[in-house]
From Swiss-Prot:
Alphabetized GO MF terms: 3-deoxy-manno-octulosonate cytidylyltransferase activity
GO biological process terms, semicolon-separated: CMP-keto-3-deoxy-D-manno-octulosonic acid biosynthetic process; lipopolysaccharide biosynthetic process
Name of the gene encoding the protein in the UniProt record: kdsB
Primary location group: cytoplasm
Record EC number: 2.7.7.38
Protein name per UniProt: 3-deoxy-manno-octulosonate cytidylyltransferase
Naturally occurring in which organism (per UniProt): Phocaeicola vulgatus (strain ATCC 8482 / DSM 1447 / JCM 5826 / CCUG 4940 / NBRC 14291 / NCTC 11154) (Bacteroides vulgatus)
Record InterPro entries: Cytidylyl_trans, KdsB, Nucleotide-diphossugar_trans
Keyword flag Acyltransferase: no
Function: Activates KDO (a required 8-carbon sugar) for incorporation into bacterial lipopolysaccharide in Gram-negative bacteria.
Places the protein is found: Cytoplasm
Keywords: Cytoplasm, Lipopolysaccharide biosynthesis, Nucleotidyltransferase, Transferase
Enzyme class: transferase
Amino acid sequence: MKFIGIIPARYASTRFPAKPLAVLGGKPVIQRVYEQVSGILDEAYVATDDERIESAVKAFGGKVVMTSVHHKSGTDRCYEAYTKVGRGYDVVVNIQGDEPFIQKSQLEAVKACFEDPATQIATLVKPFIPDDGLEALENVNSPKVVVGKNMNALYFSRSIIPFQRNVEKEGWLKGHTYYKHIGLYAYRADVLKEITSLPQSSLELAESLEQLRWLENGYTIKVGISEVETIGIDTPQDLARAEAFLKQREGE
């Protein structure tokens, strides 16, 4: 089975313009993501709508493909890039361009989901632990996932799910395993083509989570579990935290 990685990278981020080109430990963020992915998948490309990002990727020797400026999601950008670089792959892996610390184990966990021939789409979750605290569980920027016994996602929400009746909220993390969604997706190539043609759904619009469009239309999402905590970069403050984390790791 052949896997291709696509790393969507936009220049015009509302909260952090030019984020892919921000320097982290002497390298652009997008370069760090690309280097983490290279060698684990059969091939990897950055998909961008901006010539400055294209130039930066070429400068460090990466592969890049230009895509439309009109895409509403990274999934749409992934599909356009896939159609441009060739279709000889079984699975397309969508790697967030703001995850410079994505780990090999996480990519391998997503790949393993496709050992089940019934898997259409796969993603990752990380268990919340009691030490994370209630504030982390309540964070609407960390979507929660309810997972079935077959390891398929039942629902994603920015709210805390499930609600534990007759249990004080402060004790929820001790009495149940909650899962935080990690924004790494993989799709069988034919499924990717299908889901990019779907109109936005009511649940997707309500929660602002595109994966609900797929669930609402009957697609299944297989879930892999990761114990690794990643540091996504959405704001300049996140970049500062990532810089501190990198220095600490390199000093160990």
